[in-house]
Amino acid sequence: MAHLLLLHGPNLNLLGTREPEVYGRTTLAQIDAALVDRAQAAGHALDCLQSNAEHVLVERIHAAREDGTAYILINPAAFTHTSLALRDALLGVGLPFVEIHLSNPHAREPFRHHSYLSDKADGVICGFGADSYRLALEAVIARLECDA
């Protein structure tokens, strides 16, 4: 059994009501519940955390190195384009991670095209709405099974 960590960045607590034409109508609670269930069905544990504060996400990433986390799934949201702190935290703990986005940042405004995480992530899944999370988890589960 692997311990997985799912991190959600700023404004994702508003999913379901914030710009549903871009982000869909699925709530964050629905996404988390579905992923926890799927992880458990595959024999893994999944912890979820959403924060609008960069330092909270950084501190949780730091804690992941000590708590047995095997893999991080992260939707950094707006921090994708601005946060060297998240990049450095992820590199500092040395855990594999996958970057997730509900929308396709490359099909949006030019300032959303750059990610400070993508070049260090094992993979990036974007543009499939709430299914982006499910697809990312399936990829992580497959990776863990290959490594077992």
From Swiss-Prot:
Substrate binds at N75, H81, D88, L102, S103, R112. Disulfide bonds: none annotated. It is an enzyme of class 4 (lyase). Pfam families: DHquinase_II. Keywords: Amino-acid biosynthesis, Aromatic amino acid biosynthesis, Lyase. Belongs to the type-II 3-dehydroquinase family. Homododecamer. It comes from the Bacteria. One of its GO terms (molecular function) is 3-dehydroquinate dehydratase activity. The active site is at Y23, H101. Pathway: Metabolic intermediate biosynthesis; chorismate biosynthesis; chorismate from D-erythrose 4-phosphate and phosphoenolpyruvate: step 3/7. The record marks R18 as: Transition state stabilizer. Catalyzes a trans-dehydration via an enolate intermediate. Its EC number is 4.2.1.10. One of its GO terms (biological process) is aromatic amino acid family biosynthetic process. The keyword Lyase applies. Gene3D superfamilies: Dehydroquinase, class II. This is 3-dehydroquinate dehydratase. PANTHER family: CATABOLIC 3-DEHYDROQUINASE. It catalyses: 3-dehydroquinate = 3-dehydroshikimate + H2O.
